[in-house]
């Protein structure tokens, strides 16, 4: 369970958009609308170095990376001098993009319309954080695995599921949701409660999902 929590914490930090951490940024005096996701990543690197990132980066140790300035464009980058590996804005975007694809995460690019809306968003997010702090979090993966193993469309047992990668497991979840939704719509058509003409091309094809 600790390993799972640690993994998802690292994924959350690597894929975070400023709006995702507007409360934390506000607490240290940073307006979340004035920075981008790479700026946020650079702010979070110190915290990431304290985490076990091996499940994401394997043997690439973030502790060895130090901030440096790219002399060609003046941008701040992270450099591991022992290996010569550089993490810049483009590399971070690739890492975050890959993790979002694996976990089906959407980039949240929302910006408040004005200062009043921004304060309202921050206050709502702050209240939500307080509620979550008082709630004991169940294992996200465990709940999904138990649900799927007891679903007829899922053809793996508990042991078989352990052999799947995170990406394969998440794809299975989405595919099964799509198949169940398709079956329900087809039953609705035959029962006369769903109109076939109201269905889109995507609704008719359960083999793909977006």
What are these model-derived regions, one by one?
Residues 1-89, 101:
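Short N-terminal mixed-charge amphipathic segments
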Residues 189-210:
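Long, intrinsically disordered, low-complexity Ser/Thr/Pro-rich regulatory/activation regions
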Residues 60, 87-90, 136-139, 156, ...:
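Short coil/turn linker and secondary-structure boundary residues
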Residues 1-35, 93-188:
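An amphipathic, hydrophobic-aromatic interaction surface with interspersed Lys/Arg
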Residues 9, 54, 82-83, 139, ...:
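Generic serine detector
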């Amino acid at each position: 369970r600790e390993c799972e929590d640690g993994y998802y914490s690292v994924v959350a930090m690597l894929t975070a958009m400023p709006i995702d951490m507007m409360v934390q940024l506000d607490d240290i005096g940073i307006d979340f609308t004035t920075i981008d996701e790479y700026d946020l990543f650079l702010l979070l690197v110190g915290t990431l170095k304290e985490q076990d990132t091996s499940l994401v980066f394997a043997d690439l140790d973030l502790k060895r990376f130090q901030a440096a300035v790219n002399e060609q464009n003046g941008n701040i980058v992270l450099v591991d001098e022992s290996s010569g590996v550089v993490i810049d804005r483009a590399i971070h975007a690739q890492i975050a993009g890959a993790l979002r694809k694996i976990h089906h995460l959407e980039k949240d690019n929302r910006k408040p319309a004005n200062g009043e809306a921004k304060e309202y968003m921050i206050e709502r997010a702050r209240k939500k954080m307080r509620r979550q702090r008082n709630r004991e979090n169940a294992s996200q993966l465990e709940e999904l695995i138990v649900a799927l193993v007891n679903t007829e469309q899922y053809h793996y047992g508990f042991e078989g599921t352990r052999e799947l990668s995170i990406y394969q497991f998440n794809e299975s979840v989405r595919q099964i949701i799509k198949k169940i939704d398709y079956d329900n719509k087809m039953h609705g058509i035959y029962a006369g409660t769903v109109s076939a003409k109201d269905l889109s091309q995507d609704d008719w094809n359960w083999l793909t999902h977006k």
